[in-house]
């Protein structure tokens, strides 16, 4: 009855961030420093998802 062994952890996928200075796309994993690979700028913006997002008005 060990169901914990059957459950696999989610795979670490890199998120895509856009540099605030040079506007290049950077793939950043969970342990990577938040820094542009091209210019070294530290302000990064998360890229908008392509998945459909629906908000319910209440």
Curated annotation (Swiss-Prot):
GO terms for cellular component: cytosol; nucleoplasm; nucleus; RNA polymerase I complex; RNA polymerase II, core complex; RNA polymerase III complex. It comes from Homo sapiens. InterPro entries: RNAP_P/RPABC4 (IPR006591), RPABC4 (IPR039747), RPABC4/Spt4 (IPR029040). Transmembrane segments: none annotated. Coiled coil: none annotated. It comes from the Eukaryota. The gene is POLR2K. It is found in: Nucleus; Nucleus, Nucleolus. Zn(2+) binds at residues 19, 22, 36, 39. One of its GO terms (biological process) is transcription by RNA polymerase III. PANTHER family: DNA-DIRECTED RNA POLYMERASES I, II, AND III, DNA-DIRECTED RNA POLYMERASES I, II, AND III SUBUNIT RPABC4. This is DNA-directed RNA polymerases I, II, and III subunit RPABC4. Its main location: nucleus. The keyword DNA damage does not apply. DNA-dependent RNA polymerase catalyzes the transcription of DNA into RNA using the four ribonucleoside triphosphates as substrates. Common component of RNA polymerases I, II and III which synthesize ribosomal RNA precursors, mRNA precursors and many functional non-coding RNAs, and a small RNAs, such as 5S rRNA and tRNAs, respectively. Belongs to the archaeal Rpo12/eukaryotic RPC10 RNA polymerase subunit family. GO terms for molecular function: DNA binding; DNA-directed RNA polymerase activity; zinc ion binding. Gene3D superfamilies: RNA polymerase ii, chain L. A zinc finger (C4-type) spans 19-39. The keyword Zinc-finger applies. It holds the Pfam family Zn_ribbon_RPAB4. Keywords: DNA-directed RNA polymerase, Metal-binding, Nucleus, Transcription, Zinc, Zinc-finger. Component of the RNA polymerase I (Pol I), RNA polymerase II (Pol II) and RNA polymerase III (Pol III) complexes consisting of at least 13, 12 and 17 subunits, respectively. Pol I complex consists of a ten-subunit catalytic core composed of POLR1A/RPA1, POLR1B/RPA2, POLR1C/RPAC1, POLR1D/RPAC2, POLR1H/RPA12, POLR2E/RPABC1, POLR2F/RPABC2, POLR2H/RPABC3, POLR2K/RPABC4 and POLR2L/RPABC5; a mobile stalk subunit POLR1F/RPA43 protruding from the core and additional subunits homologous to general transcription factors POLR1E/RPA49 and POLR1G/RPA34.
